[in-house]
Design a protein with these regions (language model features):
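Vicinal oxygen chelate
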Residues: 2, 66, 75-134
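Short glycine/proline-centered loop/turn elements that form peptide/ligand docking sites
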Residues: 18, 36-39
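Helix-adjacent hinge/juxtasegments
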Residues: 53-80
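Short secondary-structure junctions
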Residues: 28-34, 85-87
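Residue-level structural signal for beta-strand termini and adjacent loop
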Residues: 37, 53-54, 131
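N-terminal beta-strand motif that seeds the catalytic metal site of vicinal oxygen chelate
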Residues: 1-20, 47, 61-64, 129-134
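Conserved active-site alpha-helix within GNAT-family acetyltransferase domains
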Residues: 17-26, 116
Length: 134
C-alpha cells in the first residue's frame, strides 16, 4: 500500500518569508505552489512543503535529506551560499570539516555513507549524503 506511494515531507516554520528566502537563496528551490500559510516544493524524486506553525518546534534529528553524487562539491557550493554545517564529535559520529564517514548502510545504498548536516532558517535539521560503494 504505502510502499507504492510518493513520500512527501512537511517542515514547520515560524516565519514563512524567511524560510522561502533560505530555500531559494541558499538551496536554489522555488515553490511550485503556495497558499496562505504554506509553500510546496518539488524535487526530482519527491516533494516537501513548509507550513507556518507557531506551536511546533524544529526537530533535533534529521528531518529531510538529499542524496548527492559528490558531497565535497555540494558542501562547498552550499557554504558559498552561506549555509553553515553542523560539527559533531560523538561516539560513533564525528565530522571533519562538516562531513562524517558512516560505516554500514542498507545493502542497496552501498557499504556506508558520507554525510553532512545543516539547519534551515527555522532550525530544522537537514542533511546531504553520498553513498559509499565498494
Amino acid at each position: 500500500m504505502l510502499k507504492d506511494a510518493k513520500v512527501a515531507t512537511r517542515l514547520p516554520a515560524k516565519d514563512l518569508n524567511r524560510a522561502r528566502a533560505f530555500y531559494s537563496e541558499k538551496l536554489g528551490f522555488e515553490p511550485v505552489e503556495q497558499r496562505e500559510g504554506g509553500l510546496r516544493y518539488v524535487c526530482v524524486a519527491g516533494e516537501f512543503a513548509i507550513f507556518v506553525s507557531a506551536g511546533m518546534q524544529s526537530g533535533t534529528h534529521t528531518q529531510m535529506s538529499w542524496e548527492v553524487d559528490n558531497i565535497e562539491a555540494t558542501v562547498r557550493e552550499l557554504r558559498a551560499r552561506g549555509v553553515e554545517f553542523e560539527e559533531y564529535d560523538l561516539p560513533g559520529l564525528r565530522t571533519i570539516d562538516g562531513i562524517a564517514e558512516i560505516r554500514g548502510n542498507y545493502p542497496s545504498k552501498g557499504t556506508g555513507e558520507r554525510a553532512a548536516w545543516f539547519r534551515d532558517s527555522e532550525g530544522n535539521l537537514l542533511g546531504i549524503g553520498q553513498p559509499v560503494r565498494s
